[in-house]
């Protein structure tokens, strides 16, 4: 790949610092909420996998954009993993649902092959991620975690702008 991964990350992240990873206390309830955005159906792991798949089947210009966004999502995944550790949880790719461990699945990704559908599904996924992050932030009573979530949301909003501009340029209104 031409260029550096750091350059790609810088192009698709807002450029503001991320808050330090710290929490008031270990909290399994908060960890379960964070795990949804870490490795759930609407999650950073899903976003990384979906962008990686989509960049493999698109042209160079679009490929580089999707790859750059995926790299930022990898950074978000790392942040959430560190947050899970701070909350006292192991950052495995599973969720607890009705006392069962459910592992992340590739069925969570959009398997579109048409550019229009790829961009629309990626925009939709970013919007769903923001909605999930906001719901989580409204439940959690830890300003450190909320600051981290709000910073990640800023990148997700940037991704929507980038993808929407790409859609307008490549597909039209």
Segments the model singles out, each with a brief description of its role:
Residues 1-173:
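Non-heme di-metal
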């Amino acid at each position: 790949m031409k260029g550096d991964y750091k350059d790609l990350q810088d192009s698709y992240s807002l450029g503001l610092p991320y808050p330090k990873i710290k929490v008031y206390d270990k909290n399994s309830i908060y960890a379960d909420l964070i795990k949804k955005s870490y490795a759930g159906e609407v999650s950073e792991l899903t976003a990384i996998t979906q962008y990686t798949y989509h960049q493999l089947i698109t042209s160079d210009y679009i490929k580089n954009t999707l790859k750059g966004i995926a790299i930022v999502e990898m950074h978000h995944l790392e942040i959430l993993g560190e947050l899970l550790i701070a909350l006292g949880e192991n950052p495995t790719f599973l969720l607890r649902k009705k006392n069962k461990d459910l592992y992340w699945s590739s069925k969570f990704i959009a398997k579109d092959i048409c550019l229009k559908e790829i961009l629309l599904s990626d925009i939709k996924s970013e919007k769903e991620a923001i909605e999930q992050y906001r719901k989580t932030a409204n439940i959690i009573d830890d300003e450190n975690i909320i600051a981290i979530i709000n910073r990640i949301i800023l990148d997700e909003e940037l991704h929507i702008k980038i993808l929407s501009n790409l859609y307008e340029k490549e597909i039209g209104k």
